[in-house]
Amino acid sequence: MHNFVPTSIQLKPPFYAVDWQEVADNISSKTKMIIINSPHNPSGMLFSKDDMLELQDLAEKNDLLVLSDEVYEHIIFDGNVHQSASKFEALAERSFVTASFGKTFHNTGWKMGYCAAPEKLMKEFQKVHQFVVFCVNHPIQKALATYLKDKNHYWKLSDFYQQKRDFFLHLMEGSNFKIVPSKGTYFQMLDFTEISNENDIAFAEWLTKEHKIATIPTSVFNEGRKDFKQIRVCFAKTDETLAEAAKILREL
């Protein structure tokens, strides 16, 4: 849109931390916006308070807008706290925060979410949004508005998914995969460098065809298809499915 050209900052394993100096070095007079995603898909990384302060500093110094993708905001583990762009006063003034009812309430097929921003930004947002989204299901909007009144419907999500993550990681103990536990989302990265020399796409295809386990090769998320020999698995499954998958993966 408007002939914008994205500049990507490659997050690197095992922890996928943001190199803020690299971000600063890539900002030019043409830069208009920084886009972030936390909790991060596919890595499960979280932006810390220090990360958000670094972002706020860069955005203020360079007069940049921020698009903060926070669709996994309620799926965070190990006592960590979600650092929303809306929590930082100077950052909130220049940020669009997007979130997803689909991710929060297990109904991704409904394609329902929201964007929050200061009024002056939302007026500009709406000029574009009206040509991108034709309509949404109004009865479902009403239902979700009612459902949101009970905070227990989303405040308990972290515990629910952490049990899934911990269950899966416990079953994966002793495997040949290198694993850094996910800090958020319902995804877990698995490093297969000790198992295969194949690229991640070939390895994922082999897992699907030979072992009936569907994963995502993480190079498809990267600019230039950078291959770190990692796959992404989803642990938002029944315990029986996770146990069966872990048994197969442990034997590789």
Per-region residue spans from a language model:
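Substrate-binding/gating loop at the entrance of the active-site cleft, primarily
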Residues: 1-6
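Active-site phosphate-binding strand-loop segment of PLP-dependent enzymes
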Residues: 11-78
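PLP-dependent enzyme catalytic core of the Aspartate aminotransferase-like
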Residues: 21-25, 206-215, 221-252
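Active-site PLP attachment segment
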Residues: 88-124
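Active-site C-terminal subdomain of aminotransferase-like
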Residues: 90, 120-139
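Structural signature of PLP-dependent enzymes
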Residues: 125-132, 148-170, 196-199
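Conserved glycine-rich beta-strand-loop-beta hairpin in the small C-terminal domain of fold type I
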Residues: 141, 145, 161-169, 179-192, ...
